[in-house]
């Protein structure tokens, strides 16, 4: 079950009010850092920037590949466990804007987890330990430990250990 907070805007597009929820200066800083960091080849330097400047909780030996797009409004709501791999061009969102509602929530990715290339993780999602997410999957609900998620819409199979 996705866990997120919600702010309703009746008959108004919430993106017109977004800077009432998040300071423009914070978003501007996050955009610069995230866009710059996408192209850093050093995992050590990239992890340091994400942990120290964006306050993302990243476990030991986890790697974030080239061109990964992190949420620009609330990157501090992202947690990645130890020894996990976030593949090429993955998008991790902690917010979503609907026609009349703005939602945001934490994203937690467990340890020893692989997120395949071009996957999208929606806000409020928890992905367990030892999970494999196939390339191109839209993660729209929680995935338990030892799961294998694939497709759009997403299907989950359990991996026997």
UniProtKB/Swiss-Prot annotation:
Q: Which domain of life is it from?
A: Bacteria
Q: Mind telling me which InterPro entries this protein's record contains?
A: Hexapep, Hexapep_transf_CS, Hexapeptide_acetyltransf, Trimer_LpxA-like_sf
Enumerate the UniProt keywords alphabetically: Acyltransferase, Repeat, Transferase
**Any GO MF annotation of the entry:** acyltransferase activity
- Say yes or no: keyword Translocase present: no
| Gene3D superfamilies (UniProt xref) | Hexapeptide repeat proteins
Please give the family membership noted in the entry.
Belongs to the transferase hexapeptide repeat family.
Q: What is its EC number?
A: 2.3.1.-
Q: What is this protein called?
A: Putative acetyltransferase SAR0816
The reply to whether Repeat figures as a keyword in the UniProt entry is: yes
* Pfam (any one): Hexapep_2
């Amino acid at each position: 079950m996705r866990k997120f907070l919600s702010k309703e805007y009746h008959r108004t597009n919430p993106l017109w009010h977004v800077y009432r929820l998040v300071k423009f200066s914070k978003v501007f800083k996050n955009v610069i850092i995230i866009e710059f960091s996408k192209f850093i080849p050093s995992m050590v330097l990239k992890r340091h920037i994400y942990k120290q400047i964006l306050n993302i909780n990243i476990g030991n030996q986890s790697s974030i590949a080239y061109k990964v797009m992190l949420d620009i409004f609330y990157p501090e709501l992202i947690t990645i466990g130890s020894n996990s791999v976030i593949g090429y061009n993955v998008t991790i969102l902690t917010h979503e804007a609907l026609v009349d509602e703005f939602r945001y929530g934490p994203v937690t990715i467990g340890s020893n987890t692989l997120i395949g290339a071009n996957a999208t993780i929606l806000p409020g999602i928890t992905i367990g330990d030892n999970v494999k997410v196939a390339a191109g999957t839209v993660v729209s609900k929680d995935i338990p430990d030892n799961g294998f998620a694939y497709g759009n819409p997403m299907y989950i199979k359990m991996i026997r250990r």
